[in-house]
Amino acid sequence: HREHEPYIDPSEFDADLKVIDTSLRASQDEIIADDRLSTIRAAIASFGFHLYSIDLRQNSESFENVLTEVFATAHVHPNYDTLREEDKVELLVRELQTPRPLVPRGYRGFSEATQRELDLIAQAAVSVERFGEQMIPHQIISMAQSVSDILEPMVLLKEVGLIQANGQGPTGSIDIIPLFETIDDLQAGAGILRKLWDLPIYRAYLRQRGDIQEVMLGYSDSNKDGGYFAANWALYDAETDLVEVG
C-alpha cells in the first residue's frame, strides 16, 4: 500500500489482506491464512472501520423549523414555514439542484435549537468522512406528512456534503426514509410517495441508491391515535397500498 496514506475504505484494506492471503497460500502457509488473517478479514467484512451503523432520525417539524431559519438567514425566503406545500416543494427542488451552500461554513449565528440540529448533521458528515459511508446509512423522518417533509432533510444533508448536487441530479450515500405514524398519515402514505417519485430530482437520487425506497410505519403512534383495531386495519391498508405503488 502507498506509504503513509490511509485506506480510503475497508474494501481497499481487504484488497491488501487478500494479496497477503494469496501469498501465504502460495507458500503453503494455510494455517496462518486460515487463522488470524481469516479472522481479520471476517471482521472487516462485518464491521468495516465503523464497528456499527447509526441512523439519523428527527421529527419533520424540527427540519421545517431549522430550514425556515436557515432560508431566512440566507435571504432565500423570509418565512418558509408559511408557504403552501407546492411552493415549498418548488423551493426545495431548486435548492437540491444548487451546489452552493446556504450559509458560510463555520457560521454560528442561529438560534440554539437550530444550531444544535446543524451541529449534529455536521458531526454526522465528519463521522462518514472518517469511518466510511456505512457509518450512517439512513436518514429517518418521523411524523412524515408531506413531500416537503421528505425533501427538507435532503437540503440540510446537502449543506454538510452528505448529499451532493450535480447536473445529473443529487447523489449521496444516505437512504431517505419517511416514517408514517398517525392513521391519517398511514392512509396518505402511498399518495405522498407517488408525488415524491414523480419529481425527477428525487427519482434521480433514488436511482443512484439502487431504486430502493425504504418506508417505516408507526405502530405505537397509530395505536395511540385510533386504538388497536383501527390502527392495525390502517397499517394493513397502508402496507397494501405501499406495495401497489411500489
Predicted features, each with a name:
Residues 1-130:
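Extended, charge-enriched "interface" segments that sit outside catalytic cores
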Residues 8, 12-15, 19, 32-35, ...:
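Generic recognition of stable, solvent-exposed alpha-helical segments in well-folded globular domains
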